[in-house]
């Protein structure tokens, strides 16, 4: 099966998952949201989205084995032991698939079918073979609040990401450079996709529209750049890096991989992903976004300037932080990153020395 056929299947899967998430978002119930054992929030949309993508890939790629690396599994769902929740997810999945003409007469789905579809996401990935990488609802907190979230699906072949699709149901269709991500409600909802050597495109999620090719910003003066970061406890090194570059604007806060999508079409120039302490980064949080940016002419590296390595299993092999920007800005940005890390390490050494004395 060609990559074009796989891309078509991925677009269909992600579009239907976005349709399900929109239905949940229209009337989010208290019982639709709970906390997992790691205290992170999860919703019926997370599980429904994963089940839809899993089932669509299975149906569309009938002659291809589907290895899926995804965020959720049914273990957490079984822990809450709520038949009503599982029944709601099952109905959401059934209704979503039935809304597509090609699936309207498919065999009825049971709750066990949905649980099995969710658990198809237990693959470990790795450097050999083909693996789909799914973020079923990226930015669950944003989804719950009615803010930005994304559904990202990528294909890994022999350790390399070769295509990616991302639905951003709350992102304005028109480019929002300098517009603080504001738009008319009827113009909201984007589907981004890209594949190796073919560029990145965007089209409407809600209506039939011709795809438009997108490219990263042409700004080459770091002081004029704007940057994205997640909603979380402020990370001091972000401010240090921005200061070294001469960036004066406050960061644009966006949940999820939507930052990759916005950067790919020039809504901003820099996305930094550093944490206070080094921690594992799940591949599903970056796989689709990385190829969407790179095919739009951008660069995605770790803090040392190395390309992100998605071949090591469920977690990225990377150095210290993630840097997403344009080719024009990357050299100066990496210099600022190296200087900032060095200063941070020196400060930590001083603090440790003072404690000893």
UniProtKB/Swiss-Prot annotation:
EC number: 3.1.3.7, 3.1.3.57
Binding site for Mg(2+) 3: 71
Keyword Signal applies: no
Coiled-coil boundaries: none
Domain of life, source organism: Eukaryota
Pathway listed: Signal transduction; phosphatidylinositol signaling pathway
UniProt binding sites for adenosine 3',5'-bisphosphate: 140, 256, 259, 273
Keyword set, alphabetical order: Hydrolase, Magnesium, Metal-binding, Multifunctional enzyme
Catalyzed reaction equations: 3'-phosphoadenylyl sulfate + H2O = adenosine 5'-phosphosulfate + phosphate; adenosine 3',5'-bisphosphate + H2O = AMP + phosphate; adenosine 2',5'-bisphosphate + H2O = AMP + phosphate; 1D-myo-inositol 1,4-bisphosphate + H2O = 1D-myo-inositol 4-phosphate + phosphate
Co-factor requirement: Mg(2+)
Binding site for Mg(2+) 1: 71, 135, 137
Gene Ontology molecular function: 3'(2'),5'-bisphosphate nucleotidase activity; inositol-1,4-bisphosphate 1-phosphatase activity; metal ion binding
Chain sites annotated for binding Mg(2+) 2: 135
UniProt-annotated catalytic positions: 46, 140
Residues reported in the UniProt entry to bind AMP: 256, 259, 273
GO terms of biological process kind: sulfur compound metabolic process
EC category name: hydrolase
UniProt entry tagged with the keyword Glycoprotein: no
Similarity annotation: Belongs to the inositol monophosphatase superfamily.
Stated role: Phosphatase that converts adenosine 3'-phosphate 5'-phosphosulfate (PAPS) to adenosine 5'-phosphosulfate (APS) and 3'(2')-phosphoadenosine 5'-phosphate (PAP) to AMP. Is also able to hydrolyze inositol 1,4-bisphosphate and inositol 1,3,4-trisphosphate.
Record-linked NCBIfam families: bisphos_HAL2 (TIGR01330)
Record's protein name: Probable 3'(2'),5'-bisphosphate nucleotidase 3
